[in-house]
Amino acid sequence: MAKVRVYELAKEFGVESKVVMAKLQELGEFVRSASSTIEAPVVRKLTDALQGPGGNAGKSAAKPGAPRKAAPAKPAAPSPAAAARPAAPKPGAPAPKPAEAPSSTPAAPSAPSAGPRPGPKPAPKAAPVTPVPAAEFSAPAPAQPAAPQPQAPRPAGATPGPRPTPARPAPAGGQRDGGRDGGQRDGGRGGERGGDRPARPAGQGAPRPGGARPAGPRPGNNPFTSGGSTGMARPSAPRPGGAPRPGGGQERPGAPRPQGSGPGGAPRPQGGQGQGGARPTPGGMPRPQAPRPGGGPAGNRPNPGMMPQRPAAGPRPGPGGGGRGPGGGGRPGAGGGGRPGGGGFAGRPGGGGGGGFAGRPAGPGGGGGAGRPGGGGGFGGRPGFGGRPGGPGGRGGTQGAFGRPGGPARRGRKSKRQRRQEYEAMQAPSVGGVMLPRGNGQAVRLSRGASLTDFAEKINANPASLVAVMMNLGEMVTATQSVSDETLRLLAEEMNYVLEIVSPEEEDRELLESFDIEFGEDEGGEEALVSRPPVVTVMGHVDHGKTRLLDAIRKTNVVAGEAGGITQHIGAYQVSSEVNGEDRKITFIDTPGHEAFTAMRARGAKSTDIAILVVAANDGVMPQTIEALNHAKAAEVPIVVAVNKIDVEGADPTKVRGQLTEFGLVAEEYGGDTMFVDISAKQGLNIEALLEAVVLTADASLDLRANPEQDAQGIAIESHLDRGRGAVSTVLVQRGTLRIGDTVVVGDAYGRVRAMLDDNGQNVQEAGPSTPVLVLGLTNVPGAGDNLLVVDEDRTARQIAEKRAARERNANFARKGVRFSLENLDEALKAGLVQELNLIIKGDASGSVEALESSLLQLDVGEEVDIRILHRGVGAVTESDINLATGSDAIVIGFNVRAAGRAEQMAEREGVDVRYYSVIYQAIEEIEAALKGLLKPEYEEVELGTAEIREIFRSSKLGNIAGVLVRSGEVKRNTKARLLRDGKVIAENLNISGLRRFKDDVTEIREGFEGGINLGNFNDIKIDDVIATYEMREKPRG
């Protein structure tokens, strides 16, 4: 047997697919959709369930006298007209019995019946009902499926009189009693309240008077009809023969039902074997049926195998209809339409208040499945209509179906944690309506150039909230943009956090620790350490003879090759000197003395063991002398003072010793511990004594040992881009031994060592501790002062270099430019107050480029002009630099480099300004002048002269003419003037349009002369007024 799909079975049974799916779920078979297939055993089980006592869907086609016609009603139909009608009866034929009205009264307003009543007694109805004459059936209606009709309520305790038992149509969908409310089954409310239900009188299914239904429109569940009823409600008067009323009349509030398991709780009379009332199907779907004999069986009796998966519960507390089990008024899981107390699957007009398959135990008038009045909560509950007796319309739910308790949702007590969280949320800081976490002084560590997203991750906040806060604080920042340290600190203070910016050294240490690399410590024990040469840095003021001293020591002439006679790079050299009969090696590092090279001097002091402070005997202590002294003290290195130029006229070494005493350097002859040596680098005097002092200081106060067997570590002294060699770097090996072929990482550059050169230009195979070498093979030019590391793999070197580059890039982004607030940005742009000078810097060495960039960024010529360095690099000016300058209107600065190849021709063709410098202070002075040229000119008022009005002449052509005597200065034509009267300004910004002396037009009148002045259209002048003339002259800046 082929597999059958769910929708095919639904079509065969004449029901909707969701009804079959719900029944399958009740049977424990779960399907995904209506297109799912099911196995043959499941089909048989479903067929037995639907044709058995649980519902007779699909059997109506086999009934005689009724054509099979599937007419499933949509759940959202607002009227019972969607329900099928019975086959057209002939006059005198038994009419189908309408279903009883849904119960909408609470569960216990009327007393339950103690047992079966022998004879039903007629009870007075609340309002008379006009019987419908049979003559109204003028034409038979087309055959339609029978639909259960809600029956009007009857008072509890009153039983209907006996009725004849003609054949009547079976209830929709094969509905039969016995499975609902009371009856012979226990576990439901009816069984608890009244024991076994009495048999229904045979006259229950009697036809209406006249034997035919009215031919008019069938009463529908119109939610907009008056009187709180959804059908065509009629007064509840007794009808002849006790025939049931048609229509969906709804019970009045508090009106008890006559019998059965509704809210009244009294058992209903039973007629023979055929049970009265429509029995619900699993979906509450009607189906066509033929009239059935009154005493005939109403279908298979229910059996325990048709019970739901969970035992039916007892009466549920609260209003919910008189049904059993989780379904409220209907059968558990199968609340069919038609019987009182149960809502249908699709919300057919069912019993009052009870829940269907997933109906919530609702109060009187609870929301039905399709929003029908009085219906219980259906499978797909629709909002009930308002205005029903017993309270406003509710909404169907699923509380009764899956084990959740019914009744209104209760608000549980909040835990201490919830209450504390709510309290903390109320106390949290708020900026501009944005709630922020409370820091309570907690420390947050962030790296340089961190973004708001990084900050939000640290404090478990939403980055969008931080962006909104920054907008309220007047800063335009995106979530992923690098933010300056000051901005982050401002934001942290708003939330009561303590922000800690990680230093570059700490960042680098954490980065290396992530790769299990330690920098700055010797490996091995004491036995692995060997002595190494001392590293000596020569520091001092510019032109005090530092490089000349090194030339004297090395017996070379470096000074002759330096531009401007000043050192602009760090040079590293190693010399051998005989001290006390022993050959000792000393490594010297020459640092610049110009003020622009502060960073170079700081790096030289950090990478050294001993500092030689060179002071000219004729100049004494100078600003850079003090700065170099402070660098050495900060690096905690011993200092040897070399008093140079003792052979120059006016030299006074004693004065130098006295000046340095003020800064904590006390000579040994004055009782201190600092060695002073008087030398002459030019004459070569006392050079050996200076080297001896250096060696003695190193031996006395320093432990100069290192492990040569470990991986090399060092520092980059200087780097540049060589035309034939590529990126090269002068490095000082501090520990370990550097060999050719080692994988190294220097700052954000990495590579393999292809070659090494010493300070004399000779190739070397390895370099031990305290040895300066020139390294070739790096991917790019590293920065001066970057650490050198030897790693095991190229991949590790690349990862370290890339992370360092990204970190530095973020830090640069955070430092770039001047940010404007939301309030003043628009005005600044409109007024043209923001002027930028774009620069591209190219130099011969990384240290020189760094020094030039630092000096230019420190230029301050006002807030109106800003320097923006678009690019900096080492090497010649290339075509890409010219292209960048063309697109951004930038100036290219070449420091000790020239334009290469076609770059110079391209610069001339594109009109790019390329400036070349060899001395750093020349570049700084010219850039400062260019910045001042970008400033808006400032004007000042200059008084030219004053004239007193002695006479007034009137002219019909020119107006009033003032006859004046010039008191001071001179009065010129077409200059600005103001009119003073009794020392007060009467008129401003006047123009001297005419100037005459007697009858001649003149351009100026000097002091002491008379003349005539015409002030244009201004005629309000009087005798003794003073005319003061002035002009606006441009004021020089800076």
From Swiss-Prot:
Chain segments carrying region G5: 680-682
Family the UniProt entry places it in: Belongs to the TRAFAC class translation factor GTPase superfamily. Classic translation factor GTPase family. IF-2 subfamily.
Region: G3, residue numbers: 590-593
Name of the gene encoding the protein in the UniProt record: infB
Residues engaged in binding GTP: 540-547, 590-594, 644-647
Function text: One of the essential components for the initiation of protein synthesis. Protects formylmethionyl-tRNA from spontaneous hydrolysis and promotes its binding to the 30S ribosomal subunits. Also involved in the hydrolysis of GTP during the formation of the 70S ribosomal complex.
Keywords: Cytoplasm, GTP-binding, Initiation factor, Nucleotide-binding, Protein biosynthesis
GO cellular component, one term: cytosol
HAMAP family found in the cross-reference section: IF_2_B
Protein name: Translation initiation factor IF-2
Region called G2, residue ranges: 565-569
GO terms for MF: GTP binding; GTPase activity; translation initiation factor activity
Major site of localization recorded for this protein: cytoplasm
Annotated stretches, region: G1: 540-547
Domain tr-type G residue range list: 531-703
Bias (Basic residues) ranges: 410-419
Region entry G4, spans: 644-647
